[in-house]
From Swiss-Prot:
Gene3D superfamilies: F1F0 ATP synthase subunit C. This is ATP synthase subunit c. GO terms for cellular component: plasma membrane; proton-transporting ATP synthase complex; proton-transporting two-sector ATPase complex, proton-transporting domain. The chain crosses the membrane at residues 5-25, 49-69. The lineage of its organism: Bacteria, Pseudomonadati, Pseudomonadota, Alphaproteobacteria, Rhodobacterales.
Length: 74
């Protein structure tokens, strides 16, 4: 019974990886919309774009690690 609950928890934690993909899409889409409105400011905002993508991906990686821990360590 406990192993089954760990697998369910791992599946729920893996949803965070999909949510990270949605977050990266939102960050990149909003950057593209802003760059199309004001192309001269796009070059100065590229670093902010990569920082936002890195934070969104980090959350996805943490969710993936939690899923792995629940699958194999519990």
């Amino acid at each position: 019974m406990e192993g089954d609950l760990a697998h369910i928890g791992a599946g729920l934690a893996a949803i965070g990886s999909g949510a990270a993909a949605i977050g990266v899409g939102n960050v990149a889409g909003n950057f593209l919309a802003g760059a199309l409105r004001n192309p001269s400011a796009a070059a100065s905002q590229t670093a902010t774009l990569f920082i936002g993508i890195a934070f969104a991906e980090a959350l996805g990686i943490f969710a993936f690690l939690v899923a792995l821990l629940l699958m194999f360590a519990v």
